[in-house]
Amino acid sequence: MGNTLIAIGEALIDFIPAQTGCAFEEVTAFSPKSGGAPANVCGAFTILGGSSKFITQLGDDPFGRKIAGDLARAGIDTSLVSFTDKANTALAFVSLENDGNRTFSFYRKPSADMLFSAEQVKEEWFEDAYALHFCSVSLGDFPMKDAHKKAIAYARQKGAMISFDPNLRFPLWNDKKALHDTVNEFIPCLLYTSPSPRD
């Protein structure tokens, strides 16, 4: 087991509203911020003094380049981030309720991260892995799901812990049973999980 936290999954631009407590159509301005739950975990781990790497695929577009730059400036190793011209970087418009809860409107049909394939995952990436962290957003029926399976297999071979944040985003799943079955499919791989009250 090494000392680097590796996360795999989506990175996107969150468009944060200038106003809270109102519907999307009432918001007059949004600010673009780099986000995505797995990327945020890398950022938090780095702030706490740890070493982190992030595996994702971004669109070869201004949003993708912004995310890559923001990750690097946060101290996250971006050597495992790839780019594609086959799809754009994912976007999410956010509305904020007065109690702090959020509603998301996603633009990723498909997005670049969804097209990241198992063939792109390399065993040597996990030589210094302390833990591998992932979420459910990237486990739909597209290539990134198989990339997760391969990453988990390599990480377990290297003795790394496996951490899972369900982070259920129901609007991204047309079939709620498929989401339920997919989460259950990955649970046997885990050492840690971190569901929120809304999950």
Feature-to-residue mapping (PLM):
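Glycine-rich phosphate/adenosyl-contacting loop at the front of the ribokinase-like
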Residues: 1-77, 116
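Hydrophobic faces of well-ordered beta-strands that scaffold small-molecule active sites
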Residues: 162-164
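Charged helix-capping and loop-helix junction motifs
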Residues: 146-150, 176-183
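A short, aliphatic-rich alpha-helical micro-motif
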Residues: 125-127, 184-188
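A short helix->loop->beta-strand "cap" motif at the edges of active sites that frequently abuts
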Residues: 158-160
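Conserved small/polar residues in nucleotide/adenosyl-binding loops
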Residues: 192-199
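Conserved N-terminal subdomain of the carbohydrate kinase-like
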Residues: 51-134
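Active-site beta-loop-alpha junctions enriched in small/polar residues
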Residues: 109, 137, 167-169
